[in-house]
A protein has these predicted regions:
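Rossmann-like AdoMet
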Residues: 1-125, 133-174
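Class I SAM-dependent methyltransferase core
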Residues: 128
Length: 175
């Protein structure tokens, strides 16, 4: 992709604080860097119009171990290309059976969204184990009748709760 070549110097500058926040700051806070992976993938989906996800967008702006600006800078060439061509190169939702590692979060997100939407009328509760910085319970399921539970390691859960409050994301739907 030729446009990306022009952005290599900018991407390198953006990559350093992005990696530092995700790895270094996460370690200092006692949270797992991988707890950010779902948030990262869904944020990218939100930016490219594949999934409306305001809670993820708001949380990403306040987390001390995530650089929304860094991610935006890294994806800017792909976003410009998308706006020019109308084609999304990343993130991509692959057809069923053609998924690859690159599509893991986006495909899994869409699959689970559909599964949850189809079954939530038959359930009483929804439990997210190892939730990390997942925000599904603050958006998609917020208005449901379900009792919602989000479980993770203590440090991750405390940081998430504090930062959701800072971002003014309504958490009242959680039990």
């Amino acid at each position: 992709i030729p446009i990306q070549i022009l952005f290599i110097p900018i991407a390198l500058v953006a990559l350093i604080p992005t990696l530092y926040k995700q790895g270094g700051v996460s370690a200092k806070l006692g949270t797992s860097a991988t707890a950010l992976e779902v948030l990262q993938g869904r944020l990218h989906m939100h930016w490219f119009g594949l999934r409306d996800d305001p809670p993820t967008h708001e949380l990403s702006k306040v987390l001390p171990n995530f650089s929304a600006l860094g991610h935006w800078t890294l994806l800017l060439p792909l976003y410009i290309l998308y706006k020019i061509s109308g084609k999304i190169f990343y993130p991509v939702i692959a057809p069923e059976g053609e998924e690859e590692v690159l599509n893991l979060v986006s495909n899994r997100t869409i699959y689970f969204d559909e599964l949850i939407s189809n079954r939530k009328g038959q359930a009483e509760q929804f439990v997210v184990l190892g939730a990390g910085f997942d925000t599904r319970c603050y958006g998609l399921l917020k208005a449901s009748h379900l009792k919602l539970f989000v479980l993770d390691q203590s440090a991750t859960q405390q940081l998430k709760k504090q930062q959701l409050n800072t971002a003014q994301v309504d958490c009242s739907s959680l039990t």
